[in-house]
Amino acid sequence: MRHSLPYHILRKRPMKLSTTVILMVSAVLFSVLLVVHLIYFSQISDMTRDGLANKALAVARTLADSPEIRQGLQKKPQESGIQAIAEAVRKRNDLLFIVVTDMQSLRYSHPEAQRIGQPFKGDDILNALNGEENVAINRGFLAQALRVFTPIYDENHKQIGVVAIGLELSRVTQQINDSRWSIIWSVLFGMLVGLIGTCILVKVLKKILFGLEPYEISTLFEQRQAMLQSIKEGVVAVDDRGEVTLINDAAQELLNYRKSQDDEKLSTLSHSWSQVVDVSEVLRDGTPRRDEEITIKDRLLLINTVPVRSNGVIIGAISTFRDKTEVRKLMQRLDGLVNYADALRERSHEFMNKLHVILGLLHLKSYKQLEDYILKTANNYQEEIGSLLGKIKSPVIAGFLISKINRATDLGHTLILNSESQLPDSGSEDQVATLITTLGNLIENALEALGPEPGGEISVTLHYRHGWLHCEVNDDGPGIAPDKIDHIFDKGVSTKGSERGVGLALVKQQVENLGGSIAVESEPGIFTQFFVQIPWDGERSNR
């Protein structure tokens, strides 16, 4: 039976950094040195060939200027004496041949004496017969040779012959090959030096990269990016100069910032971020700044900034932040659940007391009074709780309203749910949290406005229609002054004194974030009425 292996075992890992760098540098070095070798060898070959040709030409010119050669050309080939002079020079300079001819190409000298007096072999002498020096490669009687030709002139500057000198081509090739080996050894030495330098470079790179391989760095980077983009908190990192080096999607959304292609190194955001969040103290002293409330573009953010250290040195700072309205939304959602639990606890105590009354009446056998008591209790439950649960399908909202009804009763006031109210359950947590925040603020404001004098009345109406929830909260309190009603949703504006006026501003922000609206009407001394409209996924979640 074949057993499957984990993916990380089956996956073929890339080559190590050291292997990759050594192979790449070796390939580059080999390619470069090969090209250099070919070019240099070609130049060396040409230079060697030209050097030997120039040396032969120098010997040929010397012979052409020799008086003995000029005088010998005035005689017959066998009587000229040129053969002895040419052979002496040939042997001294290790040449293949030295041939002196007259203008009819008849030889006056040759390494093989029997060929003296015979015509020169090869048409490469023609240019020299016409008065031009010439260099050619050709085969004569002796071997393939590099041959140079120089014209001979008499005292009247009249051409009287030609000096031809030959260098054995194998000798030329041998000198070129000797030069090639020096080039090859130089190339190999360069390769060795390059490989040693590459090994040193790899060690330095590994130290800089903390011993990690490139694929490991890539994996860590991808994991970091996935982690940063998956968390809901905004994250902004800065370097030791306060320049923003990293910002995740949540931070961009909270700051209403989108990086464009023209923003290099987030310079635009760096400037605005340094004006909002002062990280200089964190970068200077390494002192964390925790739970700061900062307003950025009409958003109240809760920010924590901590230093980033490397080997004990501060190299930057990281700020994490979250919209405080989100935090408050979670707190209010939790508060709604706590209220629901408290309401159930109060009801359980109340029903326990009623069960004790029923048990007592049974022991006393007061059946008529027991019947009346049970009917009264059932009617009260139907009126108070059963009616509310029949209208409000969301257990969280129902528990929240029950707790507020009990709180109003404890304060001596009455909180009633309009008989026409209807609220389907919703699958959206944001909508439930926003409704709890809204009703909680409006009911608490109404209770505070009614004051300690009992007898006040608060009415709540919830009406759902075509995907929208319409809420009304009325109270018969003192109302809102005309000069404040237009600014009642502004931050800091309150009818309760200084250092208040945050709740309604947050309510308005949350409602509008959902795409809803909120309005108010008030008649001083008579009533205050708030109108709220928010989207509600009641139909979808109740199908």
UniProtKB/Swiss-Prot annotation:
A Pfam match: PAS
Which GO terms of the molecular function aspect are on file? ATP binding; phosphorelay sensor kinase activity
Q: Which reaction does it catalyse?
A: ATP + protein L-histidine = ADP + protein N-phospho-L-histidine
The residue spans the entry assigns to the Cytoplasmic side of the membrane are as follows 1-20, 203-543
Major subcellular location class: membrane
What is the topology of this protein in the membrane according to its UniProt annotation?
A: Multi-pass membrane protein
Q: Where is it located?
A: Cell inner membrane
**Keyword set, alphabetical order:** ATP-binding, Cell inner membrane, Cell membrane, Kinase, Membrane, Nucleotide-binding, Phosphoprotein, Transferase, Transmembrane, Transmembrane helix, Two-component regulatory system
Residue ranges annotated as transmembrane are: 21-41, 182-202
Q: What GO terms fall under cellular component here?
A: plasma membrane
> Which SUPFAM superfamilies does the entry mention?
ATPase domain of HSP90 chaperone/DNA topoisomerase II/histidine kinase, PYP-like sensor domain (PAS domain), Sensory domain-like, Sporulation response regulatory protein Spo0B
The chain positions of domain PAS read: 212-323
Q: Boundaries of each Histidine kinase domain copy?
A: 346-538
Enzyme Commission identifier(s)? 2.7.13.3
> Gene3D superfamilies from the entry?
1.10.287.130, Histidine kinase-like ATPase, C-terminal domain (3.30.565.10), PAS domain (3.30.450.20)
According to the UniProt record, what class of enzyme is this? Answer: transferase
Q: Which residues lie on this side of the membrane: Periplasmic?
A: 42-181
Question: Which residue positions does Phosphohistidine occur at?
Answer: 349
Q: What is known of its domains?
A: The periplasmic domain is involved in C4-dicarboxylate binding and sensing. The structural disorder in the cytoplasmic PAS domain has an important role in signal transduction to the kinase domain and may be the decisive structural feature that characterizes the activated kinase.
Per its database record, what is this protein's job?
Answer: Member of the two-component regulatory system DcuR/DcuS. Involved in the C4-dicarboxylate-stimulated regulation of the genes encoding the anaerobic fumarate respiratory system (frdABCD; nuoAN; dcuB; sdhCDAB; etc.). Weakly regulates the aerobic C4-dicarboxylate transporter dctA. Activates DcuR by phosphorylation.
Q: How does it associate, per the subunit comment?
A: Homodimer.
PANTHER family, per the entry = SENSOR HISTIDINE KINASE DCUS, TWO-COMPONENT HISTIDINE KINASE
Record's NCBIfam families?
A: PRK11086.1
This chain's protein is named Sensor histidine kinase DcuS
> In which organism is this protein found?
Shigella flexneri
> What lineage does UniProt assign to this protein's organism?
Bacteria, Pseudomonadati, Pseudomonadota, Gammaproteobacteria, Enterobacterales
